[in-house]
Structure formats: C-alpha cells, structure tokens
Amino acid sequence: MSAPSLVQAVAKRGWLNKMLKPVSNWYINAAGYRQMGLRADDLISEENETVLAALQRLSPKESYDRIYRIRRATQLSLTHKLLPKNEWTTQEEDVPYLRPLIDQIEAEAAEKDALDTLAVVKN
C-alpha cells in the first residue's frame, strides 16, 4: 500500500516546505473533495486487504461518519451539486484518521514477516 513519498524530504527543509505549501493548498482545493464534505482519507480505495483491516479497526462513530460522508458525496455527485460553503471540510477537520491505522497494520505485517523468516542459529 505504501508508495514512495517525498514528505520527509520536504519536511526537513523549511524553505522547500514554505515554497510548496501554497501549491499544495491550491491542489487540495482544486481536487474538490473538501467541497463535497470528504476528508483525504475517505479517498483511499477499499480494494486492499490492509485498508479493509484498517477500516475494521475504526471506532463505530468514525466508521459511521466515513460512510455518511461518502454517501453524501455520492449523492452530490449524482445531482451535480456542491455543499454550501459553510459545510465544506476545512483544513483543520481534514486530519488523517485511516492512514495511521494503515501504517500500523503495515508495520505489524513487516514485523510478522521478519519473525517468520527468522533463522535460529544453534551453537
């Protein structure tokens, strides 16, 4: 599930972060998912076993909220409308809720794989 990322490289260099932040904000607004009330993690495809496991670990409230946001966005898409501006997802509300769980599951899988391939040396 993990793809190559430049996040750490950009975060280490303050000048690069300041330079790319306006471009990042413009791109997020141009994507339009916030105008439909979605969060960035709502866009992660559910066709992966890791993501399905992460979705099962969500709290019932967060799971319900996610389904509600996706259904509302689907209805808006079908009617070719956007939410009123006061209902758009703000930058403060758009926090990752699924990505930390995915990272945790991937780390657990890597640890399990490392332990499964562990070679025991007997002296």
From Swiss-Prot:
Indicate what this protein is called per its UniProt record: Cytochrome b-c1 complex subunit 7
Top-level division of the source organism's lineage: Eukaryota
The alphabetical list of record keywords is:
Electron transport, Membrane, Mitochondrion, Mitochondrion inner membrane, Respiratory chain, Transport
**Gene Ontology MF terms:** ubiquinol-cytochrome-c reductase activity
- Summarize the protein's role: Component of the ubiquinol-cytochrome c oxidoreductase, a multisubunit transmembrane complex that is part of the mitochondrial electron transport chain which drives oxidative phosphorylation.
**Where found, per UniProt?**
Mitochondrion inner membrane
* Family that this chain belongs to: Belongs to the UQCRB/QCR7 family.
- Does the record's keyword annotation contain Cell inner membrane? no
User: What species was this sequence derived from?
Assistant: Neurospora crassa (strain ATCC 24698 / 74-OR23-1A / CBS 708.71 / DSM 1257 / FGSC 987)
Q: Which residues form a coiled coil?
A: none
| Gene Ontology biological process | mitochondrial electron transport, ubiquinol to cytochrome c; mitochondrial respiratory chain complex III assembly
Q: Name one GO cellular component term.
A: matrix side of mitochondrial inner membrane
Q: Indicate the quaternary assembly.
A: Component of the ubiquinol-cytochrome c oxidoreductase (cytochrome b-c1 complex, complex III, CIII), a multisubunit enzyme composed of 10 subunits. The complex is composed of 3 respiratory subunits cytochrome b (cob), cytochrome c1 (cyt-1) and Rieske protein (fes-1), 2 core protein subunits pep and ucr-1, and 5 low-molecular weight protein subunits qcr6, qcr7, qcr8, qcr9 and probably NCU16844/qcr10.
State whether keyword Translocase applies: no
Q: What is the lineage of its organism?
A: Eukaryota, Fungi, Dikarya, Ascomycota, Pezizomycotina
Note the SUPFAM superfamilies from the entry.
14 kDa protein of cytochrome bc1 complex (Ubiquinol-cytochrome c reductase) (SSF81524)
The gene from which this protein is expressed is: qcr7
